[in-house]
Regions:
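Class I SAM-dependent methyltransferase Rossmann-like catalytic core
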Residues: 1-72
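Membrane-proximal soluble helical/coiled-coil segments
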Residues: 63-169
Length: 169
């Protein structure tokens, strides 16, 4: 999914890296070394990022949610998403005796990454999702047993907005 939703970034990186790689064959001396270094400066961080992402998202147990186990089942679960909800359906199925309240703070004017727009087309939001503002959550104080914000809070880029969000939680 990372490549699928961020393909533009990887395409530009591949083109840039390939450009410097192939140009380096027509050069000599310091210019050849510089082109090779530029190629590596693009390829190594992007390749490392992809390998780390593969390990975290695909090879690890992160998406099997074995780490999300409760000795006492929560009565009310709030699941927070930011335009891309991969977990509400799993939570609803796994904790069917709990009441799930999925909320989504995605705001197209604030959260402008094209990858989220692409993800929303592939993964529709949970049908019970409540659209909210990250600064004004419609939850009563102490009304939930568990809040899950799995891979969503990092989408709040503004520091003040992030602080306000955590205060709301």
């Amino acid at each position: 999914n990372i490549i699928r939703f961020n393909w533009h970034f990887y395409l530009v990186s591949l083109i840039g890296s390939a450009f410097f790689f192939f140009v380096s064959f027509s050069l000599e001396g310091a210019q050849k070394i510089c082109c090779s270094i530029f190629c590596l400066c693009i390829f190594i961080p992007v390749g490392s990022s992809l390998m780390a992402s593969f390990y975290i998202y695909d090879a690890s147990n992160l998406y099997r949610f074995g780490w999300l186990d409760f000795s006492q089942k929560p009565d009310f679960i709030v699941n927070v998403s930011a335009g891309f909800d991969e977990t509400s359906r799993w939570i609803a199925k796994t904790y069917s005796e709990s009441i799930l309240i999925p909320i989504d703070f995605y705001d197209a004017s604030k959260h402008t990454e094209v990858s989220i727009k692409r993800a929303r087309k592939v993964y529709p939001i949970h049908p019970d999702t409540i659209r909210v503002s990250s600064q004004n959550l419609p939850l009563k104080s102490k009304s939930t047993d568990l809040v899950i914000a799995f891979l969503s809070v990092h989408e709040i880029r503004d520091q003040e907005e992030r602080i306000s969000f955590f205060q709301e939680l």
